[in-house]
Amino acid sequence: MWSVRMRASKKENNIEKHISGAEGIYDYSQIERVLKQLFKRAFEHSKGKPDKVVITVERINEEIQTVSALPVNTFFTNSPEEAFCLISEKLSSIGISDKALFSAFEVIKKYPMRGATLIDSITGERLERDKTRGIRVSRIHMDKRKRMKLIRQIKNLSTQPQRVIEAITIASKVASYPEVVAELCISDNPDYTIGYIASRDLGYLRITNIKNKGETIGGRAFFVKTPCDIEKLTNYLERKPVLVI
């Protein structure tokens, strides 16, 4: 099996800006088709055309771990303020402090990163080693049968089901790590105003109007129960091959 990953970016004011990314785990026979799809996708994003596209094809030599996909539910809110209240209620019910939640929102809004921030679920302290890059969840794929089942489930709720599938895949891997309590995600796509929170206890909760249309600020925060071996957690999220079933 092979891990195939794409990242597209563009330089603005001498700073590399993330445009789009995607990845999966494939048989050798699928790679050529997937490469064409990823290259096309890199140039068809609403955030504009990139000036740099990096595609990585890497053989997987270790056993691929399987994890269960989180159950999916959708909550409809009318504004970012209403969405925040819902998020606060849900996350506090599983032990995440207000301080941690405010810290996560502050990092997402003020310090845009390629990856996710790690937030202590009680103190709100940032725990990731590289606070510029963050943590990038990688080497993931969803089983075809599970993917088709979820697409049927959400097809009437989303015009971009593939985007939802990719997010569920990430969230399911993240939630499978014992010390991760929950995840908060807000898309940096200006046209996409649906975000989510996810955890083993809550499942994957899609939340409408988590931000206003046109806003490009977004990111991910993983709430972590301490003590936690951050190096081990980072290695699992970034390097352990996982198939979501």
From Swiss-Prot:
InterPro entries: BioW. GO terms for biological process: biotin biosynthetic process. The keyword Ligase applies. Keywords: ATP-binding, Biotin biosynthesis, Ligase, Magnesium, Nucleotide-binding. It catalyses: heptanedioate + ATP + CoA = 6-carboxyhexanoyl-CoA + AMP + diphosphate. Pathway: Metabolic intermediate metabolism; pimeloyl-CoA biosynthesis; pimeloyl-CoA from pimelate: step 1/1. HAMAP family: BioW. Homodimer. Belongs to the BioW family. NCBIfam families: bioW, PRK01322.1. This is 6-carboxyhexanoate--CoA ligase. It comes from Thermodesulfovibrio yellowstonii (strain ATCC 51303 / DSM 11347 / YP87). The gene is bioW.
